[in-house]
């Protein structure tokens, strides 16, 4: 990444904020978990306490509401789910153009792994981190790390 890309990433990051995140049962639309916190702050590990019943759902809808001062040509996410530091799953999401001085909501659906591949909550609890890298094209804006606790 060149210094121009880095300074563009720094500029976007300064004006980028997650306002809230919501997880819903994708089938019923019922809210499972909601947090009004800026999970985009880099250089710190965030925590999320999520109801254990989320592990029993066929699919989960994730809604991210964010604001940006700078425009982005191709806003996208690279999301890794790690268990004790090892990658279990990785997803790529692309939103596209985001206008300057806007607040946006991005919703995506994540389907559960087959039941035979699921681990129990007591094994996962505190051992799972979700590492989300936010990009504009290839320019890294920020990287968020959230440790999951099942309640």
Swiss-Prot record:
GO terms for cellular component: cytoplasm; nucleus. It comes from the Eukaryota. Its main location: nucleus. It holds the Pfam family GMP_PDE_delta. It is found in: Nucleus; Cytoplasm. GO terms for biological process: sensory perception of light stimulus. Keywords: cGMP, Cytoplasm, Nucleus. Signal peptide: none annotated. Belongs to the PDE6D/unc-119 family. Interacts with Pde6. PANTHER family: RETINAL ROD RHODOPSIN-SENSITIVE CGMP 3',5'-CYCLIC PHOSPHODIESTERASE DELTA-SUBUNIT, RETINAL ROD RHODOPSIN-SENSITIVE CGMP 3',5'-CYCLIC PHOSPHODIESTERASE SUBUNIT DELTA. This is Probable cGMP 3',5'-cyclic phosphodiesterase subunit delta. It comes from Drosophila erecta. The gene is PrBP.
